[in-house]
């Protein structure tokens, strides 16, 4: 498991108050992990802070699963490295 994946899963677990084992890549924040809209906003803010990146609102709306969060952060880091 990559460092980004581990960090994202840890943040999700802490923010949503769920066990680390429940935070699997295909899990939906709302349907599988019990998040509400405020939880998802706070989660996006925590990811932005941890990874020192900005997630535009239109992108944040698309991040509905653990894998989507991992993919966004990974892609964001790749772009930052190439700049």
UniProtKB/Swiss-Prot annotation:
Residues 2-77 form the Carrier domain. The modification O-(pantetheine 4'-phosphoryl)serine is found at residue 37. Pfam families: PP-binding. Gene3D superfamilies: ACP-like (1.10.1200.10). Keywords: Cytoplasm, Fatty acid biosynthesis, Fatty acid metabolism, Lipid biosynthesis, Lipid metabolism, Phosphopantetheine, Phosphoprotein. GO terms for biological process: lipid A biosynthetic process. It is found in: Cytoplasm. One of its GO terms (cellular component) is membrane. Signal peptide: none annotated. Transmembrane segments: none annotated. Pathway: Lipid metabolism; fatty acid biosynthesis. This is Acyl carrier protein.
């Amino acid at each position: 498991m990559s460092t980004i994946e581990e960090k994202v899963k840890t943040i999700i677990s802490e923010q949503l108050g769920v066990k680390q084992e429940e935070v699997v890549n295909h899990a939906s924040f709302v349907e599988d992990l019990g998040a509400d809209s405020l939880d998802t906003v706070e989660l996006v803010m925590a990811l932005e802070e941890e990874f020192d990146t900005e997630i535009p609102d239109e992108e944040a709306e698309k991040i509905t699963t653990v894998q989507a969060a991992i993919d966004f952060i990974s892609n964001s880091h790749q772009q930052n490295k190439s700049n």
